[in-house]
């Protein structure tokens, strides 16, 4: 065991350049590559379980923007609200416009509202 402790001590005292040279010498002597364990680690990391993709989104009106009239019109068209309700919703932002929407529907609503001048986010 004393020999192993001496080897560990000697290795600990190596400079980075000396350690790199030792690595190359050992690769040649044993016919292995130091890069192989890195590749295995990367593959193992990629095999980690993937988080489920979110399927339902809430479309949140963050801000009505400078063109509130256009945003109010778009909110009315998307939600079926009356003029006063749509105006109150836009002026009371941040407020949800649609909850539990599919990804495609949420993206469509977001793009329509942004085209009208609103700031929108999906949650």
From Swiss-Prot:
Q: Which Pfam families match?
A: Ribosomal_L12 (PF00542), Ribosomal_L12_N (PF16320)
Give GO cellular component annotations, separated by semicolons.
cytosolic large ribosomal subunit
GO MF terms listed in the record are: mRNA binding; structural constituent of ribosome
- The stretch of residues making up the signal peptide is none
UniProt-listed PANTHER family? 39S RIBOSOMAL PROTEIN L12 (PTHR45987), LARGE RIBOSOMAL SUBUNIT PROTEIN BL12M (PTHR45987:SF4)
Subunit notes for this chain? Homodimer. Part of the ribosomal stalk of the 50S ribosomal subunit. Forms a multimeric L10(L12)X complex, where L10 forms an elongated spine to which 2 to 4 L12 dimers bind in a sequential fashion. Binds GTP-bound translation factors.
Protein name, UniProt field: Large ribosomal subunit protein bL12
The species this protein was found in: Bartonella henselae (strain ATCC 49882 / DSM 28221 / CCUG 30454 / Houston 1) (Rochalimaea henselae)
């Amino acid at each position: 065991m004393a020999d192993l402790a001496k080897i560990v001590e000697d290795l600990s005292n190596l400079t980075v350049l000396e350690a790199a040279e030792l690595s190359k010498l050992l690769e040649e002597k044993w016919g292995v590559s130091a890069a192989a364990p890195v590749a295995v680690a990367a593959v193992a990391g990629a095999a980690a379980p993937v988080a489920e993709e979110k399927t339902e989104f809430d479309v949140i009106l963050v801000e009505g923007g400078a063109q509130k009239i256009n945003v109010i019109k778009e909110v009315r068209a998307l939600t079926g609200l009356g003029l006063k309700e749509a105006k109150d919703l836009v002026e009371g932002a941040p407020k949800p416009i649609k909850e539990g929407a599919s990804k495609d529907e949420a993206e469509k609503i977001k793009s329509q509202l942004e085209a009208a001048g609103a700031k929108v986010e999906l949650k």
